[in-house]
């Protein structure tokens, strides 16, 4: 054989062995395989997505100190996603989160969940169990064994065995124990090569538990090995998210039912004229007489100065929210005013909202400059002003707007009058039938508002309330 052909043949035989020679260089046959955790895996891309869930970032900063846990961060991002896209969360209007309480039973961690804060009107759509999967305990990597042969050496890599699979077990706690409760479901999990957050659909488990009235559940991640009983960090505690559709959220006064935390009628403070032993009436009491501000939604005293002591007699002492509009008091001399300022300020004993006279004067001046025809007026609601800021996480305030103005004949098209409102305004203008009021300026189109708040059990809840902000007004 020619020398050139021999060199080409030898080169073609040695070329496949180049990677193996590089592996064995410097350590012979005793070189160890890199650990599993250092090898690239397909889960790395999933890990990058999970990092968004693990790192609080700006979302946690919005929650303030003491609330920067993974559950609150996850819920805040759902809230921000709704505000950004406008799509209902999970296809419904309610998302409830439930934190776990850790206990160690038989040297194994068991997580308890109390789901009793779910309302009967909330129809469950889906439920997910979120947990942090610890990195598996891999067996030690085997060495590389090489068997020399006559012409070339062949080496075989012995990969480590796979770790044991995890079993996620759910039980109801009708017996108040984790090991004797009714088995609700179990699923096998393959631990990922690296620690990351995972989510599993447990809709059937939650729906069955609610149908049976057993909303105290336990979850256990069983690997077959005894745990040392060392609790995991609170940032890695599992939690449950329940996506639901609240069928009662469009009912009247639904926002107060879910967000109000105290009785608007203080204990021991009775309605005028009510019997001492009469039971409290949860309905809103309204005055029999109707004052002019209730007809055109304008602030009282906009057109005329009210009488000093008779202006507030049309209202009960305590409506659901007492009227924030106080009558203007007669002007006092400078000496009397100075003497009044020197008096000691005594805070009001009532929990009902009250605004000072200067605020009302500014509001009236703004309305004097606004058009008299029915239109949308600006109104910003701050939850701190009504005492709800202690449990509402976001938003702190929102633009509610309101409708006010006259619906006089002839009504322009800009006020979008209904046919009935048009006929009513004509009958009033003709004056054949006495006592016919003007059509009312009311909201026509309204927008929803997502509210992130803490329920009575300090669980973070996201609800999308309809008809919270006025978009357009019309005469009706």
UniProtKB/Swiss-Prot annotation:
Glycans are attached at residues 114, 152, 277, 467. It is found in: Secreted. It comes from the Eukaryota. Costa, costicartilage, femur, calvaria, trachea, aorta and brain. Predominantly in the cerebellum. GO terms for molecular function: cytokine activity; growth factor activity. Keywords: Cleavage on pair of basic residues, Cytokine, Disulfide bond, Glycoprotein, Growth factor, Osteogenesis, Secreted, Signal. InterPro entries: BMP3/BMP3B, Cystine-knot_cytokine, TGF-b_C, TGF-beta-rel, TGFb_CS. Pfam families: TGF_beta (PF00019). One of its GO terms (biological process) is fat cell differentiation. Its main location: secreted. Homodimer or heterodimer. Can form a non-covalent complex of the mature region and the pro-region. Belongs to the TGF-beta family. Growth factor involved in osteogenesis and adipogenesis. Plays an inhibitory role in the process of osteoblast differentiation via SMAD2/3 pathway. Plays an inhibitory role in the process of adipogenesis. This is Growth/differentiation factor 10. It comes from Rattus norvegicus.
């Amino acid at each position: 054989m020619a020398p050139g052909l021999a060199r080409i043949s030898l080169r073609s035989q040695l070329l496949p062995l180049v990677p193996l020679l590089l592996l064995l260089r410097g350590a012979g046959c005793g070189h160890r395989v890199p650990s599993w955790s250092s090898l690239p895996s397909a889960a790395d891309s999933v890990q990058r997505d999970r990092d968004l869930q693990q790192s609080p970032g700006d979302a946690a900063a919005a929650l303030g100190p003491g609330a920067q846990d993974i559950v609150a961060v996850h819920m805040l991002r759902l809230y921000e996603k709704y505000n950004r896209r406008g799509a209902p969360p999970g296809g419904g209007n309610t998302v409830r989160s439930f934190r776990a309480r850790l206990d160690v039973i038989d040297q194994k961690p068991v997580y308890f969940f109390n789901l009793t804060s779910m309302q009967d009107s909330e129809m469950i759509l889906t439920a997910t169990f979120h947990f942090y999967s610890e990195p598996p305990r891999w067996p030690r990597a085997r060495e590389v064994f090489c068997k020399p042969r006559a012409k070339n050496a062949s080496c075989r890599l012995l990969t480590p065995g796979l770790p044991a699979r995890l079993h996620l077990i759910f039980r109801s706690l009708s017996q108040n124990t984790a090991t004797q409760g009714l088995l609700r479901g179990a699923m096998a999990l393959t631990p990922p090569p690296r620690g990351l957050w995972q989510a599993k659909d447990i809709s059937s488990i939650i729906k069955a538990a609610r149908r049976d009235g057993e909303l105290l559940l336990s979850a256990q991640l069983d690997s077959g090995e005894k745990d040392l009983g060392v609790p995991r960090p609170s940032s890695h505690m599992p939690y449950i998210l329940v996506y639901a559709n609240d069928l009662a959220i469009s009912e009247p006064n639904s926002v107060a039912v879910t967000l109000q935390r105290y009785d608007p009628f203080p204990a021991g403070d009775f309605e005028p004229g009510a019997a001492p032993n009469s039971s409290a009436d949860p309905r809103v009491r309204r005055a029999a007489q109707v004052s002019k501000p209730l007809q055109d939604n304008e602030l009282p005293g906009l057109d005329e100065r009210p009488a000093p002591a008779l202006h507030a007699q049309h209202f009960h002492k305590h409506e659901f929210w007492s009227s924030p509009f106080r009558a203007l008091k007669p002007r006092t001399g400078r000496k009397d005013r100075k003497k009044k300022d020197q008096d000691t300020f005594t805070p009001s004993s009532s929990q009902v909202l009250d605004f000072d006279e200067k605020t009302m004067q500014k509001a009236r001046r703004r309305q004097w400059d606004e058009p008299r025809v029915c239109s949308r007026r600006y109104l910003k609601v701050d939850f701190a002003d009504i005492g709800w800021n202690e449990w509402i996480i976001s938003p702190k305030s929102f633009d509610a707007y309101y409708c006010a103005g006259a619906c006089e004949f002839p009504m322009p098209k800009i006020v979008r009058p209904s046919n009935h409102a048009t006929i009513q305004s004509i009958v009033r203008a003709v004056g054949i039938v006495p006592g016919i009021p003007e059509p009312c300026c009311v909201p026509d189109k309204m927008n929803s508002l997502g509210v992130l708040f803490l329920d009575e059990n300090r669980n973070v809840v996201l609800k999308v309330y309809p008809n919270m902000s006025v978009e357009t007004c019309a005469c009706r």
